[in-house]
Amino acid sequence: VKSAKPDVTVLALVGTDHHPFDRMVNLVDELLAGHDPSDGALSCLIQFGTAQAPSSAQGRDFLAKDEVKEHIDRADLVLCHGGPSTIVEILRSGKMPLVMPRDPERGEHVDGHQQRFARHMAGLGLIQLVDSVQQVRAEVEQFTAGADERLNPGIELPSPAESALRLGRIVDRLTAAAPAQRWWRRGGRRR
């Protein structure tokens, strides 16, 4: 007797940037539209920001920080933009983020920092880069097949407070080592 496939909850986060990220909204809608119910139930919540509202998925334009954390903890899979803060929050939850970085060539951001950061994190094995509904569908299928151990990178990150203290110590060392120079003249003009 074959056991029923588990229900899967996907959370998608476009972040708070003012550029619309319709590509992610469309991907999530396409994922739901193409889902076979015999593969188990699939529910998706997308925080869509300034993008168009989803037509198939449940959507909220913005979520408070505590709501984001709650939804990340409840979700089986989390798809997100390439923002470092969001990625780290998902990693802290013990999940491997499925990351679809915003593309400035498509008007989704001002520069390519999300793409560069996401490639770096993928190279470290900490995230899974995705760019198509087929890739996300494959992640859902792997999860329902029980291959979810791959989705937890098993890393421990310092708390935000500990990270801030570490950064403060680094800044203190750098400023202590810098020569005492005056880079400006009185009146605010550079020489």
What are these regions (language model features)?
Residues 68-110:
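A donor-sugar binding/catalytic signature common to diverse glycosyltransferases
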Residues 19, 62-70, 81, 108, ...:
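Residues at secondary-structure transition points
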Residues 42, 138, 142-191:
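C-terminal amphipathic helix plus adjacent low-complexity
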